[in-house]
Amino acid sequence: MIRFILLQNRQGKTRLAKYYVPLEESEKHKVEYEVHRLVVNRDAKFTNFVEFRTHKVIYRRYAGLFFSVCVDITDNELAYLESIHLFVEILDHFFSNVCELDLVFNFHKVYLILDEFILAGELQETSKRAIIERMSELEKLQ
């Protein structure tokens, strides 16, 4: 199960945070700080999986953004690594080469995309085409 998803820049500013387990506000800030500290200084030749408390964080860096997913210790790392890539591909489709400012100014759309393929902390949809079609239908309604 996914515990949380964080999108952070190199400076540690959180651009998107989605929690699937209840945490106090102070604990969320602490988690965001710790995850950033874990991933920002890791060498590129290391794996994209790192243990975090009693869970593990799977992360991927795209340009200046770190996409981090915290999951149970027994979950499949590669499935979540690919889901991060799927998320970025879908963002690229909607924002034509997504950048940090797209996430800041269109956060509502980013959350909608995320909700299309992750439900209650579990991967629900892995088809890029299906997600893009659903998002296109939602855009027609607006």
UniProtKB/Swiss-Prot annotation:
One GO BP annotation is: clathrin-dependent endocytosis
What keywords would UniProt list here? Cell membrane, Coated pit, Endocytosis, Membrane, Protein transport, Transport
Q: Does the keyword Protein transport apply?
A: yes
- What are the recorded GO MF terms, alphabetically? clathrin adaptor activity
Its localization reads: Cell membrane; Membrane, Coated pit
Q: Which GO terms describe its cellular component?
A: AP-2 adaptor complex; nucleus
Q: Which domain of life is it from?
A: Eukaryota
Q: Which InterPro entries match?
A: AP_complex_ssu, AP_mu_sigma_su, APS2, Longin-like_dom_sf
- Membrane topology per record: Peripheral membrane protein
The record's similarity note reads: Belongs to the adaptor complexes small subunit family.
Q: How does it assemble?
A: Adaptor protein complex 2 (AP-2) is a heterotetramer composed of two large adaptins (alpha-type and beta-type subunits), a medium adaptin (mu-type subunit) and a small adaptin (sigma-type subunit).
Functional note: Subunit of the adaptor protein complex 2 (AP-2). Adaptor protein complexes function in protein transport via transport vesicles in different membrane traffic pathways. Adaptor protein complexes are vesicle coat components and appear to be involved in cargo selection and vesicle formation. AP-2 is involved in clathrin-dependent endocytosis in which cargo proteins are incorporated into vesicles surrounded by clathrin (clathrin-coated vesicles, CCVs) which are destined for fusion with the early endosome. The complex binds polyphosphoinositides.
UniProt protein name: AP-2 complex subunit sigma
Q: Which organism is it from?
A: Arabidopsis thaliana (Mouse-ear cress)
Annotated gene: AP17
